[in-house]
Regions:
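Active-site environment of divalent metal-dependent phosphoester hydrolases
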Residues: 85-89, 123-128, 152-158, 180, ...
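Active-site-proximal segments of metal-dependent phosphoesterases and phosphodiesterases across multiple
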Residues: 218-260, 272, 278
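Active-site neighborhood of phospho(di)ester-bond hydrolases with catalytic His/Asp-centered motifs
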Residues: 79-81, 115-121, 125, 145-152, ...
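Extended active-site neighborhood of metal-dependent phosphoesterases/phosphodiesterases
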Residues: 36-42, 50-66, 130-221, 247-248, ...
Length: 402
């Protein structure tokens, strides 16, 4: 309804909606497509509770939709990337179908998923409503929250921010053409979601510092970004990826990030634990095969959730595991206060492809000064120590100026 000034969501605990709490949002207009967009934020939901909600405007509402909250003490999430529905071929129907199959299979096999993390490239062109329609077409998405990440294809247009409603956005000195960095907390886990289209070292450092300073009691720190800085395929050798590796590897080392979830490559893989840009292969394991108090950070790269996988066989020094297959896959990640377990499955075979387990006996981190306004020296050295960084900076400046 283009005449509505605001969107409304009503949430209750029974499907007949006789009792509910109402949340009112604001309307905006997508400057590219002219569509009206309504964003509503609901608060106060309790864990382990079944809710029903309706949405609408001007007194007209949808049918009730069920939404179930689960525990925050221990939980499981679904990790995918590169849905990347493209309207160039069959209006995106085949890719939408494969994406629905991937999501449906994952949820059928895991009825205890709390929410979904997408590591970027939700659509192919970033400016087409029909591609977003394909990405958001699975009915299951109405009952699950999905934390999205800006990818290089999302930045091709300006529609991305009209389809997401992210919390705790950080607006730095460099303008983002599509959306900002943001963070969110679920239980003991702090998720730090980066827009890797932003090359500003200072902004990314201050954003990370701000997120961590506001969550000093988190026992896990998870970075989510689109570009696979320790990835599986040809993109890992691209100049922009090398630039990003210089920025983010130092950032992740400095703030002792435990796990980094990425996409971009359309090819599943897992790095060794990385520190100071080098694999740390000498780790301590328990009887269950879990890494105990690891040194460094492990980086994961997801395949394409819509089946647009690449068949490439690269042997990078940082790669511990890779799965070269046209079969789409998905990963589940289970957290407790002291443990992390990632399992990856093939969509067609339903067989487990990979597993990575971490156990912490010490959940503390080095202290940070929330008032520090400088920049990490090692981060700056890595950033400026690459000849291609200077070229890339010039390209980025030219892009904003022209």
């Amino acid at each position: 309804d283009d005449t509505a000034k605001s969107g409304v969501v009503r949430i209750g605990k029974s499907a007949d909606m006789t009792s509910f709490k109402e949340f009112v949002g604001k309307a905006s207009t997508d400057s590219y497509t002219g569509q009206s967009v309504y964003k509503v934020t609901a608060t106060g939901l309790e864990p382990n509770t079944v809710y029903y909600y309706v949405y609408g405007s001007n007194g007209k509402f949808s049918s009730p939709v069920m939404y179930r909250t689960l525990s925050t003490e221990k939980f499981k999430l679904l990790y995918i990337s590169d849905i990347q529905v493209s309207s160039d071929v069959e209006d995106g129907r085949e890719e939408s179908y494969v994406w629905q199959k991937t999501l449906g299979t994952a949820l059928d096999q895991n009825d205890d998923i709390s929410f979904i993390v997408s590591a970027g490239d939700q659509t192919q062109h970033g400016d087409r409503a029909n591609e977003w329609a394909g990405t958001l077409s699975p009915a299951a998405l109405r009952s699950y929250a999905m934390a999205t990440t800006v990818g290089n294809h999302d930045r091709k247009g300006e529609t991305y921010p009209f389809y997401v409603n992210n919390p705790n956005e950080y607006r730095g000195t460099t303008p983002a053409n599509v959306d900002e960095n943001y963070w969110f907390r679920y239980g003991d886990v702090l998720f730090i979601v980066y827009n890797t289209q932003i090359f500003n070292v200072y902004d990314q450092y201050q954003f990370t510092l701000d997120a961590i300073a506001k969550n000093p009691d988190a026992t896990w720190r998870v970075a989510v970004m689109h570009h696979d800085i320790y990835g599986t395929g040809h993109h890992a050798a691209d100049d922009d990826n090398k630039l990003l590796a210089a920025i983010y590897s130092a950032l992740i080392d400095r703030f002792e990030i435990d796990v980094c979830l990425t996409g971009h490559e359309h090819l599943y893989g897992r790095s060794f634990f990385m520190k100071d840009t080098k694999p740390v292969k000498d780790q301590k394991y328990n009887a269950d095969g879990a890494v105990v108090d690891p040194v460094g950070t492990v980086y994961f790269t997801a395949s394409s959730a819509s089946g647009k996988n690449r068949i490439e066989d690269y042997d990078y020094e940082w790669l511990d595991f890779k799965y070269v297959s046209e079969e789409p896959s998905y990963s589940t990640i289970e957290f407790t206060k002291n443990s992390f377990t990632l399992k990856t499955y093939g969509v067609d075979s339903k067989k487990q492809i990979d597993e990575c387990k971490i156990v912490k006996t010490d959940t503390s981190y080095s202290p940070v000064d929330p008032n520090y306004k400088g920049m990490d020296t090692d981060m700056l050295q890595r950033y400026l120590g690459k000849w291609y960084v200077i070229i890339q900076i010039a390209i980025e400046v030219a892009r904003y100026v022209v």
